[in-house]
């Protein structure tokens, strides 16, 4: 019976390991044991220096999903593929439950169908400025221009609210609650 397993691979080698696993599967007659290999990715829109660029990002860096019939032979085959670290579960691979599989596959399909905005800043969000004259200042987002990849932030300078305009998304980061020390 085929079940889904999560396999840890070397980070930044996910595509290479997936291809090696697929090629080796075909050449070594393991097609009856390994049904499908998925590398969960999503398309992310990044804006840097005013340019929009769609890039592929791994949903789970360092992991592949493998649908397989687990036997000693198939386990050893996958485990010995170059770039594979281990099965989730360690010494004894643990299959994903049906609910987990359904949730994961639905999530992957939803992310395949569109492009995700990398930065999801909203008016009222607290951010820290990481670049420019106001580096390390923490403020509140007052305007967001998603089409340009820019925003405006209100910061407190000598007790007075001052607007910092034309910041690019990459120049700020969201501040977690409790992390604010102006």
From Swiss-Prot:
Protein known as: Transcription termination/antitermination protein NusG
Similarity comment: Belongs to the NusG family.
Domain of life assignment: Bacteria
Keywords of the record: Transcription, Transcription antitermination, Transcription regulation, Transcription termination
GO biological process: DNA-templated transcription termination; regulation of DNA-templated transcription elongation; transcription antitermination; transcription elongation-coupled chromatin remodeling
A GO cellular-component term linked to this record: cytosol
A matching Pfam family: NusG
InterPro entries: KOW, NGN, NGN-like_dom, NGN_dom_sf, NusG-like, Rib_uL2_dom2, Transcrpt_antiterm_NusG, Translation_prot_SH3-like_sf
Function recorded in the entry: Participates in transcription elongation, termination and antitermination.
Keyword Ion transport found: no
Stored PANTHER family: RHO-INTERACTING TRANSCRIPTION TERMINATION FACTOR NUSG, TRANSCRIPTION TERMINATION_ANTITERMINATION PROTEIN NUSG
């Amino acid at each position: 019976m085929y079940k889904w397993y999560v396999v840890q691979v070397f980070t930044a080698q996910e595509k290479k390991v997936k291809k090696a696993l697929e090629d080796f599967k075909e050449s070594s007659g393991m097609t009856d044991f390994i049904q499908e290999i998925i590398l969960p990715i999503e398309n992310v829109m990044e804006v840097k220096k005013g340019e929009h660029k769609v890039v592929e990002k791994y949903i789970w860096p360092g992991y592949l999903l493998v649908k397989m019939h687990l036997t000693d032979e198939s386990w050893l085959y996958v485990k010995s593929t170059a770039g594979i670290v281990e099965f989730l579960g360690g010494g004894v691979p643990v299959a994903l439950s049906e609910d987990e599989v359904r949730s994961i596959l639905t999530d992957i399909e939803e992310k395949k169908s569109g492009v995700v905005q990398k930065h999801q800043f909203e008016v009222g969000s607290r951010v820290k400025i990481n670049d420019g004259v106001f580096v390390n200042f923490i403020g509140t987002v007052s305007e967001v221009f998603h089409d340009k990849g820019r925003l405006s932030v209100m910061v407190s300078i000598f007790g007075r609210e001052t607007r910092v305009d034309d910041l690019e998304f990459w120049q700020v980061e969201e501040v977690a609650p409790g992390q604010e020390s102006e």
